[in-house]
Amino acid sequence: MTMKTIEFTLIFVGSALATSSEGAEIELALAPTDSKFERAAAFTTQPTGIWQGEVGEGFRPGVQTLSLEAGGAGGFAAFGGRQAHDFALTSVSYGYMLGKVVGEGHWYRGNWEIRGELFGGLQVSPSRNWLVGLTPHLRYNFATGTRWIPFADLGAGVSATDIGPPDTSGTFEFNLQANTGVHWFLRDNLALTFEVGYMHLSCAGIHKPNLGINTLKGLLGVTWFF
């Protein structure tokens, strides 16, 4: 009996070329395997930096943000308030992306972010007074696939001010916020940030009077992502 030998040459993962002693070449399919090589290759192709994929395709879990913004707020007499209160405002905030991109395949695809904001300002009308506040926010960043990343958020926190009657009467106030805006990325991890929003100040009846202060604000600044 004559024994035939077959030599195998690996040409790529998933197939091989077999050559018999008679010179015939046979292509064989190999079953896929979960080898260390394949796992290492998959690992090295994972995205790096702040993005889950390309720029604008959503943020990676754990990405942090630092924002510095300035602007103003125009008051209006509504919901019981008797005066329009106008402010010059500054804000610094820190954020953290809670998880992976959600809503894949839908227009609302994006990331949830928690933020802590410290803001301060000077009331310029109807009188000169000060205002400071600390507010946690829940923000949603839309993954558009472009350098324009819109967002929307809600916040509720505490404030201190020396604004007095007729609309407030105590130093301690709560603040409620609803905001929307956009990040425009100048480079991979730095964006211009513009936002507009509504802010309400009142003490929930702890002091009297408690008519409340209502404003519409606009802020412009920069945000670092890391």
Question: What positions do the PLM features span?
Answer:
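Sequence/structural signature of outer-membrane beta-barrel proteins
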Residues: A73-F79, V101, F119-S125, N141, ...
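Cleavable N-terminal export/targeting peptides
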Residues: M1-G56
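Transmembrane beta-barrel strands of outer-membrane/channel proteins
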Residues: L66-G74, I114-G120, A152-V158, F194-Y198
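Residue-level signature of outer-membrane beta-barrel architecture
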Residues: Y96-L98, Y140-F142, V182-W184, W224
